[in-house]
Amino acid sequence: MQQVDDAVARSGVDAGLLTLELTESVLVHDMDDAVGKMRALHAMGVRLSLDDFGAGYASLSYLRELPFAEMKIDRAFTRGIVRDAHAATITRNLLQLGRDLGIDVIAEGVEQDDQFALLGEQGCQLFQGYLFGRPMEAAAFRQRLVSP
């Protein structure tokens, strides 16, 4: 907590521009401790993201009880969305759930144009995956930002 507060203070950046991505394992390990820290981060203005939603033991109660600003749909659903009607139905409903709760939803693992198109048709507006770029070193990322 203090480390995040110090980093925000040192950088001079608005805490609302910072999003911390949490995995389910953080919540399962010590729920009471995690909840307290999450509420404190939220009070500072930090946005919280629930990673890999739909995989593992992620519970809908997390979305009800915890101050998440966004959730990321696990790639297990987006990977098969074009060929698997069940995956498409689950993804469509997770997108609707996010809209209804006022939570941004990011589709992870988008690697092909047909996945991107179908997710867009379902109302998805935020995407992550190799279709848009591969992981890169910080120097390469800076160069990409300044290149026309």
Where on the chain are the PLM-derived regions?
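Phosphate/pyrophosphate-binding loops at sites that engage ATP/ADP/AMP, CoA/4′-phosphopantetheine
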Residues: 8-14, 80
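Structural preference for long, well-ordered alpha-helical segments in enzyme cores
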Residues: 3-7, 37-38, 94, 114-116
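EAL-family c-di-GMP phosphodiesterase catalytic domain
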Residues: 17-32, 44-148
